[in-house]
């Protein structure tokens, strides 16, 4: 349904139905050619005004001191001539045209006007412009704007009057309506520095005179000469109209002022000049305007280009430049004078304090009173000098010490290397010790080198004891020899070589003993063959005695040997113990056999003889509560108890060994 409705609406729009005459609207004025021409004309004028504003802003950036101001009379005549015509046809067709006819200026005419200072002096700022093609221009004026401007001008006109009454140069030390004594003292100059201040003031006569001249000029009128300048950009229809606003009346920078003044002077040589007298109060009012009113003046094609008249700001900026140039010098001079005054004061204070101290010491000495301790000032003054001189002296002394140390180390290294070479060659010990002693006598600091102690260790022969080498190592540590790790490695190497040589010597001695035994056996055989019965009997007697001694030693029971240790170290005993199970069994059999008192286990155990001897000496309280007997015959002493024999598996190997030994 929606698609069909859209299609129906589209067809209705393509083929509109005819409308009756009663429902048709009257034709608008937009379809009329006259109205279209009028709209085109208005659009052209609007675009022209927009185009003229932008070039004027560029022109103000290039030269801000070129401005043009017309008098109050001219403005009033223009307001009388203005005619307002309004035609209101419909809401869509609203037209308002304003025409302004002013007196045209001729090419070589010189304008001169006096602007009087009053409450309702100026209502608008007029700008001159030239046009060749358009016979007239239309512009809109709003009376409300004029009313606001008049009120603002009245408010700003009262401020310059109040400022003129107040003296511009303030009193020395004036701050927030009061005179401060500290500020006066800070600017007051000392007599010792007055000569310098006079010389500086003489150097700046021209700059100060210029500033004073600018201030001494009358505040009512100022004469200014300015050359006429053409617009920066040209259009095919008309030349741009120059405008003035609040932003352009701000003080320009110093560079732009110099450049613009030079440019104006060069252009003034070939262009006519215009002398205009402008009242100063008028310019102050114009500088505070917020909404400028632009007026366009008709001009013919034969007229000269628009003239721009420079305002009072040029003179004001010149005077401000002179002031700016004078102020830095004054401030610099003031700084110098303050610094000089502070130095002079500090010097005077030091002198006075020293004199007072001297007088005090004289008075005390006269009275017989001496200082208990010296003053701190003397100590504090002496210390910095010593500190300042010490670094220089210490630097050169350290340099000399380093040179001496380098020479000593070179000499010591050379002699020690020679000693090591002699040791390797096998030179005698006395000669090497003599050279080392001479070195220590000449250079005592040689003991701090490890190479000296290494030589002493190398001199020690291989057969010497290890204690001598260790003592040398201890002496080197006490002397502070560096690097000690090198000596440690060398001592370890020497000790390892010594141990290896000792092992080799032991093997050689054993071999020597082994060679001696066969020699003795051979000698014994020779003696037996030669028939020496006495010696043989003696030898046999000696052997028999030795054998008898060995038998006695083995048969001695007190000696503990690995073979007899097991027999003498432990004892087999029978432990008698009871358990709750046995007690219950005894109660069951109590009725059958009442003769049995108790039923106990009899277990063979192995006890240490040493522990058994010690426990036998203990009191009865500390002994084992379960009795043990050494044989079965001692069981009768226990009374009418019944015993149950329980074998011990740990003792089976022991019994087996004993049985085997008995059988053998």
Curated annotation (Swiss-Prot):
Bias-annotated ranges (Basic residues): 366-375
Residues the record lists as Phosphoserine modifications: 186, 577, 584
Basic and acidic residues composition-biased segments: 28-38, 533-545
UniProt keyword Phosphoprotein present: yes
Keywords, sorted A to Z: Apoptosis, Cell cycle, Cytoplasm, Cytoskeleton, Microtubule, Phosphoprotein
Biased composition, class Polar residues, residue ranges: 300-309
Role noted for this protein: Possesses microtubule stabilizing properties. Involved in regulating aneuploidy, cell cycling, and cell death in a p53-dependent manner.
The family this protein is said to belong to: Belongs to the CKAP2 family.
Name of the molecule in the record: Cytoskeleton-associated protein 2
Lineage of producing organism: Eukaryota, Metazoa, Chordata, Craniata, Vertebrata
